[in-house]
Amino acid sequence: MSKPVITRFAPSPTGYLHIGGARTALFNWLYAKHCGGKMLLRIEDTDRERSTEAATAAILDGLTWLGLDWDGEAISQFERAPRHREVAEELVANGKAYYCYASPEELEEMREKARAEGRPPRYDGRWRDRDPSEAPAGVKPVIRIKAPRDGETVVHDAVQGDVRFPNKDLDDFIILRSDGTPTYMHAVVVDDHDMGVTHIIRGDDHLTNAARQTIIYNAMGWDVPQMSHIPLIHGADGAKLSKRHGALGVDAYRAMGYLPAALRNYLVRLGWSHGDDEIMSTEQMIEWFDVKDINKGAARFDFQKLEAINGLYMRSSDDQALFDALVAVLPEIEGGKELAEALDDKGRAQLLLAMPGLKERAKTLVELADGAKFIFASRPLALDEKAASLLNDEGRAVLKPVYPVLEAVGEWTAESLDAAIRAHAEAEGLKLGKIAQPLRAALTGRATSPGVFDVLVVLGREESLARIGDQIG
């Protein structure tokens, strides 16, 4: 019987959960779910100077917001240092690693010699077969792996295929420093083995690491997990992703008003596809996702595509769910606090009532919040430039006879209001737009908004008439 699939996401808590890390987590999560397995979370916090609790919290928050749940408790790599030392000593005892007493001066000499000969700097193995009795007094050694010197190390990769590394290029790298702390290369292997990880899915910038880690697995006689090194994300211009392209933290995307489901949908398509399917549910992603379908080429990050997908998700969202998502993000978006303060019981009811019209015009929750501002605007309304031009003398003259028409409407519904204004337009020989445009400007202070009859209903009879009255004098 085959082992259950166990993947892992292993971020370093030296900053936020960036978008590349979020995609790596998503791929690990989807593959584990697809196979009925588990995704574990390991915090690689061995860099004590740069690792912070705040960054760890931001990573956990980012994963939770994205809906990527992990199995069991998050594991701290730093806390496992005694186990890393134990395995390093075991490798020495088994003749697979050795103590190296080379001084910093000797190592610099090796580097200088390599440079002079046009070779990449490599440790020359001088303590590989020396008797430990020759060790200089008072020098704390490092532990180096006895890497094979001939042949090649092959990384069997589900995405990249077989990748071959000549062993002469890999040298006897350090697995335990002289102060007893493990190197990243060693700690990762020990942790992945002890956690039972069967599949490693990570960025292809780790491909060279995979060769060195394979050497440690082989030295311990452990099974090497199935590797999948996924291509990095580039900007739309093909250059390496930077902050100007969108290499931001997941928290920034939340504050920009993206929905987690939409961001998941966008990220899964960065380097993986299922035919021509663009929009897919989480259930479909889980059913369809397989590492063998990941592309080798770098994916390109495209904000416009993300916005378009987010807009689709917003328009298909339940009004109450979208309302809840908006309220949750208000403290984080520009101008959101003022909107949040306006949401008393009446304000909440009005915003929910306006949601069908608002979501049709917004691609993000930030745009949705901006579109809702007219509901809570103070009288007399400040008019934007286009609204002011619509409410010139001609616009006000068109609007003046509309006031008594609206005042006379019995049932204040979109249907009744529509019928009354259309009848008035016909009687005056005007096109509906000729009335709707200055009416919208008077009601919202803007030239664009949800449908004008929906706006009248959301504002209510009293507020609507008062706003029109402000403009016609």
Curated annotation (Swiss-Prot):
Record's subcellular location: Cytoplasm
| MF annotations from Gene Ontology | ATP binding; glutamate-tRNA ligase activity; tRNA binding; zinc ion binding
InterPro entries with a match to the protein in the record: aa-tRNA-synth_I_cd-bd, aa-tRNA-synth_I_codon-bd_sub2, aa-tRNA-synth_I_CS, aa_tRNA-synth_I_cd-bd_sf, Glu-tRNA-ligase_bac/mito, Glu/Gln-tRNA-synth, Glu/Gln-tRNA-synth_Ib_cat-dom, GluQ/Sye
Presence of keyword Cytoplasm: yes
Q: Which amino acids does the record list as binding ATP?
A: K243
* Example of a GO biological process term: glutamyl-tRNA aminoacylation
Instruction: Name the Enzyme Commission number(s) assigned to this protein.
Output: 6.1.1.17
Q: Where is this motif: 'HIGH' region?
A: 11-21
PROSITE patterns (UniProt xref): AA_TRNA_LIGASE_I (PS00178)
What UniProt keywords are attached to this protein's entry?
A: Aminoacyl-tRNA synthetase, ATP-binding, Cytoplasm, Ligase, Nucleotide-binding, Protein biosynthesis
Q: Does the keyword ATP-binding apply?
A: yes
CC terms in the record's Gene Ontology section: cytosol
Chemical reaction(s) catalysed: tRNA(Glu) + L-glutamate + ATP = L-glutamyl-tRNA(Glu) + AMP + diphosphate
Main localization of the protein?
cytoplasm
Return the Basic and acidic residues bias intervals. Answer: 113-133
Domain of life of the native organism: Bacteria
Return the Pfam families for the record. Answer: Anticodon_2, tRNA-synt_1c
Q: Where is this region: Disordered?
A: 113-136
Show where the record puts the motif 'KMSKS' region: 240-244
NCBIfam families in the cross-refs: gltX_bact
State the similarity comment.
Belongs to the class-I aminoacyl-tRNA synthetase family. Glutamate--tRNA ligase type 1 subfamily.
Describe the function of this protein: Catalyzes the attachment of glutamate to tRNA(Glu) in a two-step reaction: glutamate is first activated by ATP to form Glu-AMP and then transferred to the acceptor end of tRNA(Glu).
Q: How does it assemble?
A: Monomer.
Q: What is this protein called?
A: Glutamate--tRNA ligase 2
Please name the source species: Brucella canis (strain ATCC 23365 / NCTC 10854 / RM-666)
Give me the gene this protein comes from. Answer: gltX2
